[in-house]
Regions:
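C-terminal alpha-helical cap of glycosyltransferases
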Residues: 115-130
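Short N-terminal micro-motifs specific to bacterial/archaeal maturation
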Residues: 13-16, 76-77, 113
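Short coil/turn linker and secondary-structure boundary residues
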Residues: 17-20, 81, 117
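Catalytic binding pocket for nucleotide-activated donors in carbohydrate/polymer assembly enzymes
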Residues: 3-4, 38-111
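Donor nucleotide-activated moiety binding/catalytic core segment of transferases
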Residues: 1-41
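Alpha-helical elements of Rossmann-like donor-binding domains used by nucleotide-donor carbohydrate transfer enzymes
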Residues: 28, 85-88, 121, 125
Length: 130
């Protein structure tokens, strides 16, 4: 078993115990490993690599079900079923390899409305000129 000393594994309780929230750190990351959490959809706005842990995909499908008909279509990143998949994902990140940029853009277009000029649109709405 490899020891990945430069990777920090955090759970919500680790953050909560220290009065912190995940979203305070997300912009500092180079990539995100997630399960089926909606944080992955939010992370699309950063356009950085995503990896999805799917080792319990079948069990999750049977026990909870999905919002989308084809949930894997909405997971635009490395699908990791075992430690080797995880290690490959980390190596790709280390080597600057991004295999899912186009897929992320496609899912981002489906899940996020207009993603530019937010401030200008607010100013326009309130008839504020700068």
């Amino acid at each position: 078993e490899n020891v990945l000393t430069n990777i920090v594994y955090l759970e919500n309780r680790d953050l909560a115990d220290n009065g912190l929230q995940l979203y305070e750190f997300i912009n500092c990351s180079d990539a995100l490993v997630s399960d089926y959490s909606s944080v992955a959809i939010d992370y699309l706005l950063l356009d950085r690599p995503l990896g999805f842990t799917l080792d319990d995909y079948e069990a999750y499908t049977e026990s909870r079900g999905w919002v989308f008909d084809d949930p894997l279509e909405y997971m635009p990143g490395e699908h990791m079923y075992n430690m080797q998949d995880f290690e490959n994902f980390i190596l790709d990140i280390k080597n600057g390899k991004d295999n899912y940029k186009e897929q992320r853009a496609s899912v981002r277009a489906k899940t996020h409305n207009v993603c530019d000029n937010y401030c200008q649109r607010v100013l326009d709405y309130f008839n504020i000129t700068m």
